[in-house]
């Protein structure tokens, strides 16, 4: 059954982006891809996603900055953001402190290496 929900996958690892997108497409989600925070912002302007899977550490603009920009913008604050992080053991909640000493407003996070089944379950829960 077709799904009109759009998920934007943002990571500087093209192989991971492809793997996540293939899994999402197998569950009939529409997908868009970006490889850094600046490209992601452009994609968000083109077509507003329902959910963003966002890597934390990327060139040009990192995931923390993009997440904070989205969550502090009334036009985009309701977009669900799931962070991908290699430092998941340091995360105790979604409003955790990152390197600059600021907290992030992400809706959830998943540690790397990514468990695709767990990520899909999280996406399904958020998409209702």
Explain the meaning of each model-derived region:
Residues 1-6, 117-128:
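Non-catalytic signal-transmission and effector/linker regions of two-component phosphorelay proteins
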Residues 28-35, 43:
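Short hydrophobic/Thr-rich beta-strand motif most characteristic of the beta2 strand and flanking loop
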Residues 65, 88-110, 117, 121:
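Alpha4 helix (beta4-alpha4-beta5 surface) of REC/receiver domains from two-component response regulators
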Residues 35-39, 62-68:
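Acidic catalytic/metal-coordinating carboxylates
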Residues 55, 85:
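Active-site residues of response regulator receiver
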Residues 47-53:
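Active-site beta3 strand of CheY-like receiver
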Residues 18-26:
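Charged docking surfaces used in two-component/phosphorelay signaling
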Residues 58:
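Receiver (REC) domain active-site loop signature in two-component systems and cognate sites
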């Amino acid at each position: 059954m077709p799904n009109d929900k759009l998920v934007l996958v943002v990571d500087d690892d093209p192989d991971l982006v492809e793997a996540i997108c293939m899994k999402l497409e197998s569950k009939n989600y529409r997908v868009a891809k970006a490889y850094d925070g600046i490209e992601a912002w452009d994609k968000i302007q083109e077509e507003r996603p329902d959910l963003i899977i966002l890597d934390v550490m990327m060139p040009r603009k990192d995931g923390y900055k993009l997440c904070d920009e989205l969550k502090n913008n009334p036009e985009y604050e309701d977009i669900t953001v799931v962070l991908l992080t290699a430092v998941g053991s340091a995360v105790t909640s979604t409003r955790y402190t990152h390197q600059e000493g600021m907290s992030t407003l992400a809706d959830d996070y998943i540690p790397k290496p990514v468990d695709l089944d767990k990520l899909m379950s999280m996406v399904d829960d958020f998409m209702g």
